[in-house]
């Protein structure tokens, strides 16, 4: 089964680079937290380090929201470790604050529907998985375009808000902005205020 919104996320257990050493990382390890699972095509390329570094630098913001960021690549754990040992000025990652999962057998990329089979690399997929293990959001970019950290964080906050408060969120919602009560009668309050 390929990953789908509103369905249980495919489980996994992979060797990862965590704080400069190899460790086993599984989805089950993060039960009870939101997980932002992102895929990259290849280590030692051009867009990928910009994404990993940006998400790594925002790791604390995600943690504060009860979320864990994970990045996965079809590269080996050895290649990913070597990449973290190269300075950022030279296209490396340097020390990072998020796990890098090695999907060497491509099962994770395949299960999440991002594997380009003939090339053996993953598209830039981003999946938000809730504390119950249900996929709440999927985006998949073509290879040349990176993702937006602020948007990923906003989406985590948005799903947390709806889970807690039962309201729905309009286009361009940000924390603190107006929400919509999801009934025909109650929603009028939002629409009247938004369309003065």
UniProtKB/Swiss-Prot annotation:
Q: Where is this cross-link: Glycyl lysine isopeptide (Lys-Gly) (interchain with G-Cter in ubiquitin)?
A: 14, 89, 132
EC number(s) given by UniProt: 1.11.1.24
- Effect caused by changing residue 171 to S: Exists mainly as monomer. Has no peroxiredoxin activity
Q: Which family does it belong to?
A: Belongs to the peroxiredoxin family. AhpC/Prx1 subfamily.
Q: How is it modified after translation?
A: The enzyme can be inactivated by further oxidation of the cysteine sulfenic acid (C(P)-SOH) to sulphinic acid (C(P)-SO2H) instead of its condensation to a disulfide bond. It can be reactivated by forming a transient disulfide bond with sulfiredoxin SRX1, which reduces the cysteine sulfinic acid in an ATP- and Mg-dependent manner.
Q: What is this protein called?
A: Peroxiredoxin TSA1
* CDD domains in the cross-refs: PRX_Typ2cys
Q: Which residues form the active site?
A: 48
Please report the organism this UniProt entry assigns to the protein.
Saccharomyces cerevisiae (strain ATCC 204508 / S288c)
Q: Which reaction does it catalyse?
A: a hydroperoxide + [thioredoxin]-dithiol = an alcohol + [thioredoxin]-disulfide + H2O
Could you tell me what this protein does?
Thiol-specific peroxidase that catalyzes the reduction of hydrogen peroxide and organic hydroperoxides to water and alcohols, respectively. Plays a role in cell protection against oxidative stress by detoxifying peroxides and as sensor of hydrogen peroxide-mediated signaling events. Protects the cell against the oxidative stress caused by nascent-protein misfolding and aggregation. Relays hydrogen peroxide as a signal to the transcription factor YAP1 by inducing the formation of intramolecular disulfide bonds in YAP1, which causes its nuclear accumulation and activation.
* Miscellaneous notes: The active site is a conserved redox-active cysteine residue, the peroxidatic cysteine (C(P)), which makes the nucleophilic attack on the peroxide substrate. The peroxide oxidizes the C(P)-SH to cysteine sulfenic acid (C(P)-SOH), which then reacts with another cysteine residue, the resolving cysteine (C(R)), to form a disulfide bridge. The disulfide is subsequently reduced by an appropriate electron donor to complete the catalytic cycle. In this typical 2-Cys peroxiredoxin, C(R) is provided by the other dimeric subunit to form an intersubunit disulfide.
